[in-house]
Each structure stands twice: as structure tokens, then as C-alpha cells.
Swiss-Prot record:
SUPFAM superfamilies: Chorismate synthase, AroC. It comes from Chlamydia muridarum (strain MoPn / Nigg). This is Chorismate synthase. FMN binds at R123, S124, S125, G281, K296, P297, T298, S299, S300, R324. Disulfide bonds: none annotated. This reaction introduces a second double bond into the aromatic ring system. Homotetramer. The gene is aroC. Its cofactor is FMNH2. Reduced FMN (FMNH(2)).
Length: 357
């Protein structure tokens, strides 16, 4: 398995959905960064299940710092973070020993390894992303020390979509973090969709934005900022699409409508628009980074689905009533997208510091 992400600033996550705990080891964090257990609370609360429109699984997601921190300062050594699994229930997964769940990774894992942990998806479960969010807290503190702000939010839910990118401000950040379910969509329309067919699930889109980034983040040729971001975002469970700026819509434009014109403003060169999403040649250009990540509908639904037993016999699979799943994974994926954004930017920031003397 490939459990590591990043180069100079890297993370290695471990653990399974229904194991005793999950966690992450962070390597490459500079010494002297203030870090305390309470720093993890806001981000972990945003991702935590058991909230509005999410899985009823109850997890406190308290983060325990095992190493790499002394007197609430990072020491420059690997930081190990532990999160206990407190509410795992494996009874509803016992039937999976004899059949395959449509849309899940179980079939692929068994084909690759000859064995799979069916309890809650095991290693392939989105439960693993709690460790990424914890690591993202450390990355965000580094970015904040450099004046870089980041944010992700729900911009698509089923047939609902809003493609606008708001300007990143401190009031917006406070609003997002203080809300149990922030979105630029109509919450009433989302509620109506969920009530219309409670046995089904929905896909969604998560947008991300940053404050203007320093010029130079991203490495030619295979370390481009969008390329590394795409790898990070597409590693999140249930992702099916990624774009920067206008993304796929740019394929339907002409050059004259797409190009971001240069302008001189107060003695500095800038851009009239930001259709490129903040990068040229895969390198940041002093503009905000803007992009979106698409998530497929949750595979665990109450509606009957055609499947087969492990002997190849046709069956009808239906998620057990006691099973606990999100109606739309994109809702809780918001914090995961933000974490992967932060982790990628910190790694590239450190690489940029090494690019020239």
C-alpha cells in the first residue's frame, strides 16, 4: 500500500475504520511551531460524524499528541497523532463475508490482496480521512504563520450547483467554522432533496479557495501545483473529478475569452481575471488559488441493488437498517479537501525555499 503523501513535508496515515484507533505521523514540520491538543478541536468538529446531514456514528475525534511536541512547541522530529475509534459497530457488515457491495472497494481489495477487511470498509473507509484533517491542522498553522489563508466549502449537492468563488475574508472563515453545515447553496433545497428520497444518496462538489499565494509555489515539470493538488484530492475516498479555475469549462472557450489579461496596478503587475485559477505553468502567480473537487453519491444506500455472491450467484443487496452512512459524502469531505490543500501548499512552500540560494 502507498500510505504516504508529500515530500519535504509528508504524512503517513494508518489504521482502519473499525480498528481500535487511527492516526498519522507527520515528518518535516519545522521546530518551534506552537501546537497544543486544543488546536485540533475546530477542524475535527467540522469533520466529525453525528451532525446535520451526516452519518449517525458518534466519534469525539479527540487528538492525542504522542511525539514531536514539547512544552506545546514542535521539536522538528516526527509528530505522531492518535485518534481513538469509539463508536465502531461491525454487526451490519457480517453478511459481506459472502457477497459484494456495489460501488465499494471490497471487490478491488480482494482482487489485489486476496483478502479484505469488510468492517466499515477497513482501510478504504473515509474514516481514515480524520487523520488527514488532524495533519492538516499542523499544515494550516504553518501557512498562517506565512500569511496564507485557505478555505473549502460545499458548492454542489445533487442537481444543485453554485460555481462562484467568494473572496476569502476573515469574516467568511469565521462564518464557515461556526456553522454546523455551511454551504453557498440553499439549505432548504438540500433538505427537500433529502426528504424526497431518504433511501437514496447524492453526489456533491467541494470548492476551495486561498488568499493570494506567493509567486513560485509549484515545481516544473512533474511537481506542478495543480498536478500535486490533483493527486492529493483524488486520493480522498469517493472523489471522481478535479479542476483548477475554469477547469473543464475552459475546453468550450476561445482564447480571447479565456486568457487572463495582465494589468499594472499601483506599480505592480497583476491580472484582470483569474480564469486560470491562480497558476501558470503549474506555478502560483500571486493570485488566489481556486478549484473544485467532485464526489460521487454515497455507495451505501437503502434501495435494493443487483449484486452477486462470492460464488457468482445473483443476489439483491440492500444496506442493513443498522448501517450508518452519510447521505452525501461531500458534506464532511469539505474539511478533508481543505486539509489536502493545506498539506500540499506547505510541502510546496518548503520546496520553494530550497529552489534558489
Amino acid at each position: 500500500m502507498h500510505n504516504q503523501y508529500g515530500s519535504l513535508f509528508s504524512i503517513t496515515t494508518w489504521g482502519e475504520s473499525h480498528g481500535p484507533s487511527i492516526g498519522v505521523v507527520i515528518d518535516g514540520c519545522p521546530a518551534g511551531l506552537p501546537l497544543a491538543p486544543e488546536d485540533f478541536l475546530p477542524a475535527m468538529k467540522r469533520r466529525r460524524p453525528g451532525q446535520l446531514h451526516t452519518s449517525p456514528r458518534q466519534e469525539t475525534d479527540s487528538v492525542t499528541i504522542l511525539s514531536g511536541v514539547y512544552q506545546q512547541k514542535t521539536t522538528g522530529t516526527p509528530i505522531s497523532l492518535l485518534i481513538q475509534n469509539e463508536d465502531a459497530s461491525s454487526t451490519s457488515y457480517e453478511q459481506l463475508n459472502d457477497c459484494y457491495r456495489p460501488g465499494h472497494a471490497q471487490f478491488a481489495y480482494e482482487g489485489k490482496y486476496g483478502f479484505a477487511d469488510n468492517r466499515g470498509g477497513g482501510r478504504s473507509s473515509a474514516r481514515e480521512t480524520a487523520a488527514r484533517v488532524a495533519a492538516g491542522v499542523v499544515a494550516k498553522k504553518i501557512l498562517s504563520s506565512q500569511g496564507i489563508k485557505t478555505l473549502a466549502f460545499l458548492s454542489g449537492f445533487g442537481p444543485l450547483e453554485n460555481k462562484t468563488y467568494p473572496k476569502l475574508t476573515d469574516p467568511l472563515i469565521r462564518k464557515v467554522y461556526s456553522s454546523p453545515f455551511y454551504t453557498i447553496l440553499s439549505q432548504e433545497e438540500i433538505q427537500n432533496l433529502l426528504l424526497h428520497d431518504p433511501e437514496d444518496s447524492f453526489g456533491g462538489i467541494v470548492s476551495f479557495i486561498t488568499s493570494p499565494l506567493p509567486i513560485g509555489l509549484g515545481e516544473p515539470v512533474f511537481g506542478k501545483l495543480p498536478a500535486l493538488l490533483a493527486a492529493g484530492m483524488m486520493s480522498i475516498p469517493a472523489t471522481k473529478g478535479f479542476e483548477i479555475g475554469e477547469g473543464f469549462a475552459s475546453a468550450h472557450m476561445t482564447g480571447s475569452t479565456y486568457l487572463d489579461s495582465f494589468i499594472a496596478k499601483e506599480g505592480e503587475i497583476s491580472f484582470q481575471t483569474n480564469r486560470c485559477g491562480g497558476t501558470l505553468g503549474g506555478i502560483s502567480i500571486g493570485q488566489p488559488l481556486e478549484g473544485r473537487v467532485a464526489f460521487k453519491p454515497t455507495s451505501s444506500i437503502r434501495k435494493p441493488c443487483p449484486s452477486v455472491s462470492k460464488d457468482g450467484e445473483p443476489i439483491t443487496y440492500k444496506t442493513p437498517k443498522q448501517g450508518r452512512h452519510d447521505p452525501c459524502v461531500a458534506i464532511r469531505a469539505v474539511t478533508v479537501v481543505e486539509a489536502m490543500l493545506d498539506l500540499t501548499l506547505v510541502d510546496l512552500l518548503l520546496q520553494h525555499r530550497c529552489a534558489k540560494l
